[in-house]
Amino acid sequence: MAVIKCKPTSPGRRHVVKVVNTDLHKGKPFAALLAKKSKSGGRNNTGRITVRHVGGGHKQHYRLIDFKRNKDGIPAKVERIEYDPNRTAHIALVLYADGERRYILAAKGMKSGDPIQSGVGSEIKTGNSMPLRNIPVGSVVHAVEMKPGKGAQIARSAGAYVQVIARDGAYATLRLRSGEMRKVPVDCRATFGEVGNAEHMLRQLGKAGAKRWRGVRPTVRGVAMNPVDHPHGGGEGRTSGGRHPVSPWGVPTKGYKTRSNKRTDKYIVRRRNK
């Protein structure tokens, strides 16, 4: 994998930094694992904008990813590593011994031809998945479930990982990249290793249009709006907004805690670093 800075042959190329992976599959994705993906433009069923800065972008197919890794005891082989437009990580097409194919997240160092397996008896190696109760303390893992059988929810993006730092009774304690320490049931599954494509963070899109290709619309500052649109709007001439920074709905934006799920507070051992 190489990081390439483009030559400034045009204003749009001047600041582009690409991450090039020559090992990615160059053909079409596996058709049986594709699903339709319709765009909402950030609107809900009544037509109102519920998510700002969303709209347009290239048409995409959704890749059906196996986040549960529940084919226990059946050996599989990585057929190829593919690009996925729906996430920062790359994905791997794996072929199981019974003939079934599935997409999984491609772990760091995973390549075509690698053997992988899920379940309690699996070898401790990158790409293999098993419950946290069988994973050695100190291991680096990704694609971690929060509820047994629900599918991976933690550490799924490019370069992500968590570390298993303790196991006590029915819960394992994980240290997340953010610094948060969290308890997860030991029956939840995790996959050894880090998520691949960690160089994703080094890329630079170089121009606004590249964001538009990805379905991201512009962000307008509150002080540039009218009073009807934002608490910072209005005023004669250029203003500072006149108050501490808030969202369009008046919620403070600088360090204000908005977490309200008290039911799961007991699982957080330490809040994330600021």
Swiss-Prot record:
MF GO annotations: rRNA binding; structural constituent of ribosome; transferase activity
UniProt-listed GO biological process terms: cytoplasmic translation
InterPro entries: NA-bd_OB-fold, Rib_uL2_dom2, Ribosomal_uL2, Ribosomal_uL2_bac/org-type, Ribosomal_uL2_C, Ribosomal_uL2_CS, Ribosomal_uL2_dom3, Ribosomal_uL2_RNA-bd_dom
Region of interest (Disordered), residue spans: 223-264
Superkingdom, taxonomy of origin: Bacteria
Assembly, per entry: Part of the 50S ribosomal subunit. Forms a bridge to the 30S subunit in the 70S ribosome.
UniProt-listed NCBIfam families: rplB_bact
Stated name of the protein: Large ribosomal subunit protein uL2
Originating organism: Shewanella denitrificans (strain OS217 / ATCC BAA-1090 / DSM 15013)
Lineage, opening ranks: Bacteria, Pseudomonadati, Pseudomonadota, Gammaproteobacteria, Alteromonadales
Annotated gene: rplB
